[in-house]
């Protein structure tokens, strides 16, 4: 399957190109809901991170979660639980994505090493402010 190219996005209007980041449009689904969001591609993040409000929109109930996750860095003191959702990027095949669903609402949807970068090949062309994404080779 061919790759798709995306442009870097500015987080806030009026900022310089130095503040542009790699945000990827992605659709997340569960049996209880579906959302379209912009996920921050973060090669330095060990895990995918799902903000609290997005988890609620997908139909998750905090009190019913049973798989605690310990986050690191700026989220180290915030409780999180492991959840699985179906993810779709453009016309690529859907994949199961594991997220650390955090109670923090002020964090972006983060696509990290586990397991976004295990499901997709990503190539960054920062000097051109673009990046390419394609499904991993074994995915047809």
Predicted regions and their residues:
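Pepsin/retropepsin-fold aspartyl endopeptidases
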Residues: 1-140
């Amino acid at each position: 399957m061919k790759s798709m190219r995306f442009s870097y996005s500015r987080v806030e209007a009026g900022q310089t190109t130095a503040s542009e980041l790699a945000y990827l449009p992605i659709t997340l689904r569960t049996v209880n809901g579906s959302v379209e969001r912009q996920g921050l591609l973060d090669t330095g993040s060990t895990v995918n991170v799902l903000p609290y409000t997005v988890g609620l929109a997908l139909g998750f109930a905090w009190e019913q979660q049973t798989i605690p996750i310990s986050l690191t860095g700026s989220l180290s003191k915030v409780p999180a639980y492991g959840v699985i959702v179906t993810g779709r990027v453009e016309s690529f095949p859907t994949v199961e994505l594991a997220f650390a669903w955090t109670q923090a609402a002020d964090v972006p949807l983060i696509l990290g090493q586990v397991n976004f970068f295990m499901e997709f090949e990503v190539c960054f062309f920062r000097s051109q402010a673009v990046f390419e994404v394609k499904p991993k080779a074994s995915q047809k």
